Structure formats: C-alpha cells, structure tokens
C-alpha cells in the first residue's frame, strides 16, 4: 500500500506580496526552497493561517536571501500581504517507509529567514 505523506513544509512564512497580474504560482526565496527540498514547478499546498484559505499552486524560484513569499495570479486573491502561511509539499511512499517517515520542517522568522 502507498500513502501520501507530508514531504516538507515552510511553517508560518509571512506573505511579502501578492501579484494578481503575474503568471499563477508562488515565488519562494531560493534558500527556503532548498531548505524545504522544493523544486521549480513543484505542486504545493498553501494554508493561510490568518483567513483559513487552503489551495494549491506551483513553485517558482525567488531571489535567494530576499525572504520573498509572493502569491501570483489567481492565488493572489486568497491572501493578503502580511498573512502567515504554511507551504506544504507531499510525496507518495510505500507503507513500510511511511511507518518511520519524518518530513522536513523549515521554521522562519518574521522576515522569512531560516531559524537555526
């Protein structure tokens, strides 16, 4: 049996911008992408802590070290600048691997810099 498991998440990132007229996606600081093992065009779930919205989109690479978390296109209607979001990616694993599965969790400060 296979299971869909949380692969990684960026926990409580601050939305830095929302650009309605840009091609749909979420721009994420490249350093955060690497820490969360996210690739360009990878599907992610977005959970807005402030308003309860939950939706999916795909990742595009933002400037490294900028702290950018920008929702683009239609997704821009689901968030507001300053909202806290959880960005989650999932992976399918077999049942035995799932028993000991541990996702990668990236915690950030209010400027979306990785907490160590």
From Swiss-Prot:
Its main location: cytoplasm. Its cofactor is pyruvate. It catalyses: L-aspartate + H(+) = beta-alanine + CO2. Keywords: Autocatalytic cleavage, Cytoplasm, Decarboxylase, Lyase, Pantothenate biosynthesis, Pyruvate, Schiff base, Zymogen. The keyword Cytoplasm applies. GO terms for molecular function: aspartate 1-decarboxylase activity. Catalyzes the pyruvoyl-dependent decarboxylation of aspartate to produce beta-alanine. This is Aspartate 1-decarboxylase. It comes from Syntrophus aciditrophicus (strain SB). The lineage of its organism: Bacteria, Pseudomonadati, Thermodesulfobacteriota, Syntrophia, Syntrophales. The gene is panD.
């Amino acid at each position: 049996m296979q299971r869909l498991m949380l692969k990684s998440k960026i926990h409580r990132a601050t939305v830095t911008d929302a650009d309605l007229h840009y091609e749909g996606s979420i721009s994420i600081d490249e350093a955060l992408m690497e820490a969360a093992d996210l690739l360009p065009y990878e599907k992610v779930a977005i959970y807005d802590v402030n308003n309860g919205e939950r939706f999916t989109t795909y990742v595009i690479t933002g400037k490294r070290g900028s702290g950018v978390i920008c929702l683009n296109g239609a997704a821009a209607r689901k968030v507001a600048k300053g909202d806290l979001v959880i960005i989650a990616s999932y992976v399918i694993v077999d049942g035995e691997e799932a028993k000991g599965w541990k996702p990668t969790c990236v915690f950030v400060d209010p400027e979306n810099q990785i907490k160590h």
